[in-house]
A protein has these predicted regions:
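Acceptor-binding helix/loop patch of EC 2.4 sugar-transfer enzymes
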Residues: 43-45, 92-127, 329-331
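A charged, aromatic-enriched C-terminal amphipathic alpha-helix characteristic of glycosyltransferases
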Residues: 59, 345-356, 360-397
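A short, active-site helix/loop in glycosyltransferases that binds the activated sugar's phosphate group
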Residues: 131-166, 177, 244-245
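Conserved donor-binding/catalytic core segment of Leloir-type glycosyltransferases
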Residues: 140, 175, 179, 188-207, ...
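Nucleotide-activated donor-binding/catalytic signature segment of Leloir-type glycosyltransferases, i.e.
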Residues: 231-233, 240-273
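Short alpha-helical segment that forms part of, or immediately flanks, the ligand-binding pocket
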Residues: 273, 296-300, 311-315
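Aromatic "clamp/platform" in nucleotide-sugar-dependent glycosyltransferases that forms part
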Residues: 287
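Short hydrophobic beta-strand element within catalytic cores of glycosyltransferases
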Residues: 304-307, 317, 323-325
Length: 407
C-alpha cells in the first residue's frame, strides 16, 4: 500500500509514519494546490516576516489539501488536514477537532464552549461535507477529549453528523515500553542520591516551567531534592508570559540555584530518556497541551507524572499512575485563560495546587514505586504498538465499523 503523507514531523512519526510494515510512504505536499496558492505566506514565514499567531499560521497554511496532479497513492493519511477530493481514499488523525479554523478555536477555548456561532461558517460546512463522503475512511481522534470536541462541532451540522460519526473513533497513540520492569526502574533511580524531579519542555512558559521553578524554589527551603531541567526557555506564544521580565527572572532563578538544579538547554533524545529513567517524578503543570506525549513517554520509563487536569491529560494521567492538578476548564476540558482576570485565576490556582501536590509527594515518597509499576501496566494496556498497527490497517482497508463495534 502506498500512503500519501504531508510531513515527517513528530506527530506523523507518532501516529502513522512507518506503522505498517507493508506500506510505502510518499510525501505529497508539493502536489497541494493550497501550498502554491499560499506561496507568498510561506515565503514570509521562511524569512520570519509572517505576522500571525501560531494558531493563525496553522489555519492558513496546514489544514487544506487538494491534489493538482495524480499522486499515485492508494490512500492518504493526514494530521488535522482536510482532503478536498471526492474519490481519493483518505484517513485523518484529529488532534482537537476538524476543521480547525480560528472561529472554531475561539469557541472551543471560550469559558462556555458555545459553538452555535459556527453554524453559518461556510468553510466549516464545506470541510464537513468532504469528511462525510465515503472516500474518507476514518477520523481518528487522539483522545476521548478530542472525540468530544469533534462531536460538539458535528452537533452544529446535523446534516453531516450521522455519516461522520460512523467513522469517528479514538485510538490512543502507540508507545513502546522504555523499561521493562519495576526492578529496572529501581536500579535507575538508585543512581540519583536524592529524590529527583524532572521537567522537559521547549515551550517553557506554556508548559508551566515558570510555576515549576517558583514552587520548587519555595519547597527547597523545607525539603531536600534535585531538579533536572531540560528546556531552551522558548516562548511559543506571548500570551503565556506573565510579565515583561519573565525570561530574565527565570534565568536568574536557575543560575542562583544550580546547586540543586541540573540545567540543560537541550539534549539528544536518548539522553533525555536516560534522565527521565533516573528521575522519580516528572512534571507537566501545563497551561495548554492537546495530548501531552511526554506523559506517556515518562510512564513508559516508569516515571509517574504530576500534570494539570486539562484536555487529554485526564485520560493519560490519574491518581493510580500519577497526580492531577485541578485547574479551571470548560465543558470540553479546555483550559479557561483568555482574559487577564482568567489568566490570574489560572496562574494562582496552578501555583497553589502544584505546591500542595509536590509537597504531598515529598511527604509520601512510598507511593511513587506503586505508581511507577502502574505506569508500565498502563502503557502496555492502552498504547501497545502492535495492537495500534492492526487497528490502523483495518481503518485503511475501510473496516472501521469492525473496530467501532468492538469498542
Amino acid at each position: 500500500m502506498r500512503i500519501g503523507i504531508l510531513s515527517k514531523n513528530y506527530a506523523a512519526k507518532r501516529l502513522f509514519l512507518n506503522k505498517l510494515a507493508n506500506a510505502i510512504y510518499k510525501d505529497i505536499r508539493f502536489y497541494n494546490y493550497y501550498l502554491w496558492k499560499n506561496a507568498h505566506l510561506w515565503f514570509l514565514k521562511i524569512i520570519g516576516k509572517l505576522n500571525m499567531s501560531p494558531e493563525e499560521q496553522a489555519s492558513k497554511l496546514f489544514y487544506d489539501y487538494k491534489a493538482i496532479l495524480p499522486t499515485k497513492c492508494d490512500l492518504y493519511h493526514f494530521f488535522n488536514t482536510i482532503n478536498y477530493s471526492k474519490k481519493q481514499p483518505w484517513v485523518i488523525s484529529v488532534e482537537s477537532g476538524v476543521p480547525w479554523p480560528l472561529e472554531v478555536i475561539r469557541c472551543v477555548e471560550s469559558s462556555n464552549a458555545d459553538l452555535s456561532s459556527i453554524k453559518n461558517n461556510r468553510y466549516v460546512k464545506r470541510a464537513l461535507y468532504y469528511l462525510s463522503l465515503p472516500n474518507c475512511r476514518g477520523l481518528i481522534a487522539l483522545s476521548k477529549c478530542s472525540q468530544n470536541i469533534q462531536l460538539e462541532i458535528l452537533n452544529q451540522f446535523p446534516e453531516y453528523k450521522e455519516q461522520i460519526v460512523k467513522k469517528l473513533i479514538t485510538l490512543y497513540p502507540p508507545q513502546d515500553l522504555i523499561i521493562k520492569s519495576i526492578s529496572e526502574k529501581i536500579n535507575y533511580t538508585k543512581k540519583s542520591k536524592k529524590f529527583t524531579f524532572i521537567y522537559v519542555g521547549r515551550d517553557f512558559f506554556r508548559k508551566g516551567g515558570r510555576e515549576t521553578l517558583q514552587v520548587l524554589s519555595e519547597l527547597k527551603k523545607k525539603y531536600d531534592f534535585n531538579l533536572i531541567l531540560i528546556s531552551n526557555l522558548r516562548i511559543d506564544e506571548i500570551k503565556y508570559l506573565r510579565s515583561s521580565h519573565d525570561i530574565e527572572d527565570t534565568k536568574k532563578l536557575i543560575n542562583d540555584n544550580l546547586s540543586w538544579i541540573e540545567f540543560h538547554e537541550s539534549l539528544p533524545n536518548n539522553e533525555v530518556l536516560e534522565k527521565i529513567k533516573q528521575s522519580n517524578v516528572a512534571l507537566l503543570p501545563t497551561w495548554m497541551d492537546t495530548y501531552g506525549y511526554s506523559v506517556i513517554e515518562c510512564q513508559a520509563c516508569g516515571t509517574p507524572v504530576i500534570s494539570t487536569s486539562l484536555r487529554a491529560l485526564t485520560e493519560t494521567n490519574d491518581d493510580k499512575v500519577g497526580w492531577l492538578i485541578k485547574v479551571p476548564v470548560n465543558k470540553l476540558n479546555t483550559p479557561i485563560h483568555n482574559t487577564k482576570e482568567e489568566q490570574d485565576i489560572f496562574h494562582d490556582t496552578l501555583s497553589k495546587e502544584l505546591y500542595k501536590t509536590i509537597e504531598y509527594v515529598l511527604l509520601h515518597t512510598d507511593e511513587v514505586q506503586t505508581k511507577s509499576q502502574n505506569c508500565l501496566k498502563r502503557i502496555e494496556k492502552y498504547h501497545d504498538p502492535q495492537k495500534y498497527a492492526k487497528k490502523l490497517d483495518l481503518i485503511y482497508n475501510n473496516k472501521i465499523s469492525e473496530l467501532r463495534n468492538n469498542v
